[in-house]
Amino acid sequence: MTNTKYYPDVSANVDFAAIEREILKFWQNNNIFQKSIDHRDGESEFIFYDGPPFANGLPHYGHLLTGFIKDVYARYQTVKGKKVERRFGWDCHGLPAEMQSEKELGISGRLAITNFGIEKFNNHCRASVMQYASEWKQYVTRQARWVAFDNAYKTMDKNFMESVLWAFKELYNKGLLYESMRVMPYSWACETPLSNFETRLDNSYRERTDKAITVSFMLNDITLFNSMISQKLGMTGGDNFKEYRILAWTTTPWTLPANLALAVGSDIDYALVNKNDVCYIIAASSVAKYAKELGLSGKENFEIIKGLKLQGLSYKPLFNYFENHPNSFKIFASNFVVEGEGTGIVHMAPGFGEDDQILCESKGIELVCPVDNSGKFTKEIPDLEGVQVFDANDKIIIKLKEQGNWIKTEQYIHNYPHCWRTDTPLIYKAVPSWYVRVTQFKDRMVELNQQINWIPHNVKDNLFGKWLENARDWSISRNRFWGTPLPVWKSDDPKYPRIDVYGSIEEIEQDFGVKINDLHRPFIDELTRTNPDDPTGKSIMRRIDDVFDCWFESGSMPYGQAHYPFENKKWFVEHFPADFIVEYSSQTRGWFYTLIVLSTALFDRPPFLNCICHGVILDATGQKLSKRLNNYADPLELFDRYGSDALRVTMLSSNVVKGQELLIDKDGKMIFDTLRLFIKPIWNAYHFFTIYANADALKGTLNFTSQNVLDIYILSKLKIAVNKIEESLDNFDTQTAYHAVSEFFEVLNNWYIRRSRARFWKKEKDTDKQNAYNTLYSCLETMTIAMSALVPMISEAIYQGLHNTAITQLNCLLLEGKHVVQNPMSGTQDYNTSVHLCNYPTLSDFEINHELVSTMDNVLDICSNSLFIRSTKNIRVRQPLACITIISKHNNNLKDFEDLIKDEINVKTVIYRDDLENYAHKKLSLNFAILGKRLPHKMKAIIDASKKGEWETSTLGLVICGEILNSNEYKLVLEPHSHIKGTANFENNSSLLILDLELTSELIEEGYARDIIRFIQHARKEADFSITDKILIEIISEFDLSKIIENYGDFIKEQTLGEFAKNFMPDYVSKVALENNLIQLKVKRL
């Protein structure tokens, strides 16, 4: 026996995490990532934008999921021949960095930061934003994601910031920017406004209970209604009401001190309710809710008037804080007032409500906003100065009760927006801000969105499309510190107004005569100059305090990373838009949105052409992953336990890539199952090949010419799988791609290898044996390349092993790190050190034998169904059965594989029939969910008819109760006649098999012989014998086995490479049970 080995010694029980660590070393030592880019120089590019994360926190499972998806398509496009640059990037500015710094410095609020010093604060932010960069690199590298960290862009870099300035000025020059004091979502905890889309990020709405109150406002003019309605209302004590009071309902009592108007619905019916000669005005539909407060019995009749008649009436202010405010304290009609909750009357505080501001401005009422940046009342409300608005509610309610304006207090449960950084409830507050006129070009955004391929596809017109249709102007300025400063300088003297907007560092340097080394505050704030429009020379141009919304910077990533237009103009034109981006679904309100806003406004182009919106990862109970809940494991721990390929497969083969949720358990059972059910079968096929190829001292080659029917079948299945993976990944569908891999290895292991064992085991090294090795080798090498993006490290390990590189020595390759391998795509010699440097296989010289595949798949179906019947009847596979009857219209094809069927399911005879009607009938199975929606009124009759078999098929389809059913509304299921046992359907429910389950004594004896063979093979394995070792066997039994040995002894010896003997010193002894009888088995290696 030769000692020549062409392949590593591969263990069946392998530590995949250890293998991955070796692969990572191999990639690093051989610079494989950079080679994968360099060797595609001159090829067309696949443009990929890497959305920048913040580096002031550790990566979580969501980051890993996004990273896995990015890596799959980058690797895939590389093996498809594209050049794929993968430049990493960091988000550096904004609230995440500032909040972290405030926490670390022990300060809070704008005043505290100013006192601390803006320069020192921003220096701390600059240092803190990158504090986890090394950990990020560790996580990203360990997950086998290839990115260029060394050339990473940062939004805090001067060049990136300058591109942001350019974008701002471009928008300004196009008339797409304006400054305004508008009501916006406002985080009092962060002391900054938020964009409307930021309140939609990460499900920032929380259930909250607030006090909703109803208050009465006294009308000033009480004569309007008296003469008209006093008699109808049955008043007492005279012909006049003493007072008219209009009732308003609000969930924000703290806004009442800033009330300046009331709004009613023009067409809403309002009831005039008499209580003790006071007329209360309330929507007629809401009267019943206030019966107790208004002393009503439910039998009263009310005078009804339309809301339009109330317009223009004035009322007495609840408080005297703004009693002299011009044009205020009147009732106005508006179409945003609706019936339902409350009283049908809305109180207007234009400083705290967007609709309020719009209505009041249209009536000449200037807003008031007596709340400061930290959400506390200012001195304009002296009774509440310094009180946080939510803490003021009870104080306001008490005062209203004392004044006689209070009617009712309720506990109101509603979904309320919270700050996405601090999780504190937002308020709506008027703040000065710069806005992008998104409403001016939103229709164009909707048009450009149609050019984007969204995954899932419904995002285009639903989640994202509807968001674009309702887009609002975007507030892009923030009164914060750590960010790109708005390049706007204003005159400090309103008598000589002037605004200068700068779009480059050069422009700033020219006007201010200084060298700009840092664009951040406070350095940029210190740049001042005399106002050129002031003839007195006294007014000064000063920069406004605001910085950019960090989302503006994220949306500037395509040109910011290139320092466009100051550098790399040609590069940018060639790399815009992106071919592909990916993030989780909430980014339709974040990065995806800001990208398309700026891309449309600046370039009139979509920013990307393909976009995956994946779902979110939750714990096993459906809760968000949280450090506080301790409901997830550190990803690095899972990598060390199961490897990162297993986590990659777990995530990307699930519905999370289609925008749905993925529930993952803390202990990693789901990942272990992936390892066991997906990755281990791949390794098992590789292990089988190496162990037998080494035993035979044979080397496999890429060869697709074998005429063996099993070889042709598995090579056809291989090409089908390779094509399916390619089609799936071309369509950004990893789920289907992983299924194609799993399905192929299921057939390879459990059909091809098992059915070809005799070819691998036989002694002769003939052409048939070599063809078997070549075929299995071709399957393994081709699939490692095809699936290299899906399981990059296991693919690399197998690929290297197939090229005679020991797994533990991957970082010690010879020939200057290169191996000569055959490329299955071209048939030429390529110098590839890695599977990731190969070209995607096409198998262009091999034609799929579709007829063989169809027939063999039916054979496989017959065998698997037969084995299932055995399992359900508790008949072991080693027990022979008399026959199987196959009832099909395609028996002629099946007859060619009769011996295979007999051997696989262990039967003596195969009987073929085509008279299906004598064995089974068609049963109608209805799809109630679909059919019930179309024909709800006929469902009972259709169900009854289906049970009675009162239906028929025609050229038009299936007809029942006079209705023609659609193909997705029913199935015709083959159902055996009740007296027939041991049956199963196959060939898409059009054929039937019947397994004869009766056991004769001869069949039972042969079954025992096969059991003995299994016991001996198990003993060989436990004794650690080689598969080629010949052995001695002795069997000592409690019952007589002589007849079995006499009839099947030669068969037993052939299958086990053994000879029967007695009185020898065994290497291994075992005791086993055969049909409840004890057998002692002794074996010895010869």
From Swiss-Prot:
Location, primary (coarse class): cytoplasm
The cofactor required is: Zn(2+)
Q: What is its EC number?
A: 6.1.1.5
Intervals of motif 'HIGH' region:
53-63
**SUPFAM superfamilies attached here?**
Anticodon-binding domain of a subclass of class I aminoacyl-tRNA synthetases, Nucleotidylyl transferase, ValRS/IleRS/LeuRS editing domain
Catalytic activity reported: tRNA(Ile) + L-isoleucine + ATP = L-isoleucyl-tRNA(Ile) + AMP + diphosphate
GO annotation, cellular component aspect: cytoplasm
* Quaternary structure annotation from Swiss-Prot or TrEMBL: Monomer.
Record function comment: Catalyzes the attachment of isoleucine to tRNA(Ile). As IleRS can inadvertently accommodate and process structurally similar amino acids such as valine, to avoid such errors it has two additional distinct tRNA(Ile)-dependent editing activities. One activity is designated as 'pretransfer' editing and involves the hydrolysis of activated Val-AMP. The other activity is designated 'posttransfer' editing and involves deacylation of mischarged Val-tRNA(Ile).
Instruction: Tell me the domain comment.
Output: IleRS has two distinct active sites: one for aminoacylation and one for editing. The misactivated valine is translocated from the active site to the editing site, which sterically excludes the correctly activated isoleucine. The single editing site contains two valyl binding pockets, one specific for each substrate (Val-AMP or Val-tRNA(Ile)).
PANTHER family, A to Z: ISOLEUCINE--TRNA LIGASE, CYTOPLASMIC (PTHR42780:SF1), SOLEUCYL-TRNA SYNTHETASE (PTHR42780)
Its recorded name reads: Isoleucine--tRNA ligase
